[in-house]
């Protein structure tokens, strides 16, 4: 009787150990690595995206401290870049080449390492400066600088320069000497034009009236004193 009970207990313990051995590998198989969880989040982002091309993981920040619970949300920060593969092709992004001058997005959020839970709690922005997940813990408070009034110091006053200007002697250059012109004057032949055939002028002389006859004045003979 005791032998049957012992065998029954041993069978129960064997069954429990067998079930435990089956459950532990299945649980470990459901857990993802940090990079696999991020890649799954990138796939979900491509599924929900309305853009023409797929995005591929470009850079992944350092993972946080390891946590035994795969269902605990873990902070994540990574960068994705646009590829040359169109989104309707459903091609794995890891097999696509990056597009030259493609768009780059910075993504932050949380992911879980459990395959069953939905890991998508990611926000992506374009043109945002990238910071690691531990950056808020290392930030130091900025010290405000004390505002001082601007200095009210008058500037230096310099007297105007009293430097005499240069004195140059007057130019003593002789003027140019040109020889007198020795050009022969023009030689014209004497004019040989016939004069106009005018008749000699006949002008009447001036007409004066004849003088009146001379009449002596009516005086007597002259008388001289001293003579009788």
UniProtKB/Swiss-Prot annotation:
Sequence repeats lie at residues 148-157, 158-167, 168-177, 178-187, 188-197, 198-207, 208-217. GO terms for biological process: antimicrobial humoral immune response mediated by antimicrobial peptide; defense response to Gram-negative bacterium; defense response to Gram-positive bacterium; innate immune response. PROSITE patterns: CATHELICIDINS_1 (PS00946), CATHELICIDINS_2 (PS00947). Keywords: Amidation, Antibiotic, Antimicrobial, Disulfide bond, Repeat, Secreted, Signal. Residues 148-217 are annotated as: 7 X 10 AA tandem repeats. Transmembrane segments: none annotated. The modification Proline amide is found at residue 225. Its main location: secreted. This is Prophenin-2. It comes from Sus scrofa.
